[in-house]
């Protein structure tokens, strides 16, 4: 397929109605969530597809960085859920297959190259992506760092070992495993073993979760990680359906509905995380596309998040980096929770 046809095909696929509901970064925002007519994005969003315009509109690369356990990270981290096929697109079951078909190795490389050019120096994803990350390092000369969620067929400890062996700079316990252990099984020994064994690998070790109860459980049992990977997003969008089942876990540890991982009001999350001195990487900040980064990022950072992990297609990276640069234009914004990292 020639470049012109490829550009058109990509444009048509990504600007369809389903994409507007699911895209993880800037183009994900749909004005339907504000009870207004949906507007098809044009202009800069489309021109970003053109190879010669990859970095068009970038004010400057990121300047906001901080360290967790000696590892320097950009305050904005590239999320890998979409690349791995975990798209979180409400009830549209086809979408996982769609993003898997879209994200060939070459498109993953393109995403990484643009992220690095914009100053985003870290990808956070699953061990399933180790192959393509290592290929990118080897064949493209990329330097992007890798944080692993350790979700692995042999368990999270084996996932941590495999991840570090394949170049991970940091690891954390996948939120699904952590929520199941804390909220469903009340198994504090799970966390103690994970932390003890993973720390033998010599990298920072975190705990991920969707439920605030998981953080509280770990603190109560003195299972303290080097960092938290905790969700936060608005819960007043029209499809939230808040009610008695707003936060119920199935035996698997997953929520009753897709994208219903964190229906805890954001302020409640911010208030509790303000009591924790460990660095906090916030994720699902856009709620799988219910909010634009211009609205969601400032709330998350000023509410207490030290870093944001956000899934971004190649054409979304520039806009998202510009948003973060604006937030940190005059240094660290004032907020109730001290900055960590």
Regions found by a protein language model. Give the residues of each.
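N-terminal secretory signal peptides and thylakoid transit peptides that target proteins
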Residues: 2-21
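C-terminal segment of N-terminal export signals and the immediately downstream linker at the start
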Residues: 28-74
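Conserved, mostly hydrophobic/aromatic
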Residues: 78, 205, 280
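Active-site-adjacent beta->alpha loops and helix N-cap segments on the catalytic face
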Residues: 129-136, 156, 179-193, 267, ...
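Acidic (Asp/Glu)-rich catalytic clusters
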Residues: 133-141, 160-167, 222, 274, ...
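Glycine-rich phosphate-binding active-site loops on the catalytic face of alpha/beta enzymes
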Residues: 177, 232-234, 303-317
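Catalytic alpha/beta core domains of metabolic enzymes, predominantly
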Residues: 208-297
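C-terminal helical cap(s) of enzyme catalytic domains, especially alpha/beta-barrels
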Residues: 317-337
């Amino acid at each position: 397929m020639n470049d012109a046809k490829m550009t058109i095909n990509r444009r048509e696929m990504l600007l369809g109605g389903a994409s507007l509901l699911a895209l993880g970064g800037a183009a994900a925002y749909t004005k339907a969530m504000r009870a207004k007519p949906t507007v098809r994005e044009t202009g800069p969003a489309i021109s970003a597809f053109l190879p010669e315009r990859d970095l068009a509109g970038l004010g400057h690369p990121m300047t906001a960085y901080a360290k967790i356990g000696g590892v320097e990270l950009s305050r904005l981290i590239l999320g890998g859920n979409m690349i791995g096929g975990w798209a979180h697109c409400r009830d549209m079951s086809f979408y996982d297959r769609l993003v898997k078909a879209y994200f060939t190795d070459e498109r993953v490389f393109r995403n990484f190259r643009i992220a690095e050019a914009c100053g985003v120096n870290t990808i956070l994803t699953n061990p399933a992506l180790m192959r393509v990350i290592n290929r990118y390092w080897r064949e493209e000369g990329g330097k992007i760092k890798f944080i692993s969620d350790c979700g692995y067929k042999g368990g999270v400890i084996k996932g941590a070992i495999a991840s570090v062996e394949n170049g991970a700079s940091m690891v954390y316990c996948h939120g699904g495993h952590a929520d199941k252990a804390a909220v469903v099984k009340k198994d504090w020994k799970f966390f103690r073993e994970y932390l003890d064994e993973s720390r033998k690998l010599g990298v920072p070790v975190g705990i991920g979760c969707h439920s605030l109860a998981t953080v509280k459980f770990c603190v109560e049992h003195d299972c303290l990680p080097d960092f938290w990977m905790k969700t936060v997003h608005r819960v007043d969008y029209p499809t939230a359906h808040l009610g008695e089942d707003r936060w119920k876990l199935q035996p698997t540890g997953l929520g009753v509905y897709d994208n219903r991982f964190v229906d805890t009001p954001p302020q409640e999350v911010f208030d509790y995380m303000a009591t924790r001195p460990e660095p906090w990487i916030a994720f699902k900040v856009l709620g799988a596309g219910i909010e634009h980064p211009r609205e969601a990022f400032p709330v998350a950072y000023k509410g207490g998040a030290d870093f944001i992990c956000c899934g971004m297609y190649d054409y979304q990276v520039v806009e998202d980096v510009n948003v973060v640069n604006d937030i940190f234009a005059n240094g660290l914004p004032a907020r109730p929770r001290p900055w960590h990292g």
